[in-house]
Amino acid sequence: LFILVNIFCKGFSEYYNLENLLRQMPVYLAEVFLMIPMAYILVLGEIDISVGATVCLSATLSCMMCNTGAPFIVVILTALIVGTVCGAVNGFILTQFEELPPMIVTLATQIIFRGIAEIVLGSGGSISASNTDGFRLIGGKVGKIPYILFLVLILAVIFAVILGKSTFGRRVYAIGTNRLTAYYSGIHVKKIRFIIYTVMGTFCG
């Protein structure tokens, strides 16, 4: 995409434009980060629309923990645990009530997760972390390149290899192609779906 834009838009690769692109990169990389496990859900032929609410609830509770003076590692663990629990809730409902469409289930959990966040904050409330030193660390840069770019690239390669080359990945494709056939082939359909939705929640955290 960068090469194509550079061909058709003269001056795109000028220094000031590239510097601005690098400055804004962390915002977009956060979305790319969530797309990595979402790819697995899409391969299943499903969708999870509760990711925004999961991020919201995880951020709310982790910020509250941060404002109590908890160590940064505890703040991070809080976010990861909350996200994982939200993902596990989605996975549990979808695997126990397989007749329910994923879009409807995750729409419902989206409302629930966001509602919990609003109850915690109060109507129209907001919250911010009082101690941002730890967040500055993970949001740091190597030169002008943000750390998260390297994390996203590493995770993208790992998840792509797992999906394309591993037995687990082939099973995910089999479930997405025909869930019933995959089940009668001996694939643990419920287990795999539960794992994928739980991992999605962890990434949201």
Model region roles, listed by residue range:
Residues L1-Y16, L44, A117-L121, A160-T167:
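Structural signal for alpha-helical transmembrane segments and their membrane-water exit/capping regions
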Residues I3-K10, Y16-T68, I93-E98:
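Single transmembrane alpha-helix segments in multi-pass membrane proteins
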Residues V27, V51-A59, V75-G83, P102, ...:
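Alpha-helical transmembrane segments of multi-pass membrane proteins, especially transporters
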Residues Y28, A59-L61, A108-A117, Y184-G186:
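Small-residue-rich segments of transmembrane alpha-helices in multi-pass membrane proteins
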Residues E31, M35, T84-F92, E118-I119, ...:
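Transmembrane alpha-helical segments of multi-pass membrane transport proteins and ion-pumping complexes
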Residues P71, V75-A79, V85-N90, V142-G205:
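Helix-loop-helix "hairpin" substructures at the membrane interface of multi-pass membrane proteins
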Residues L100-K165, I192-I195:
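Transmembrane helix-bundle core of multi-pass membrane transporters
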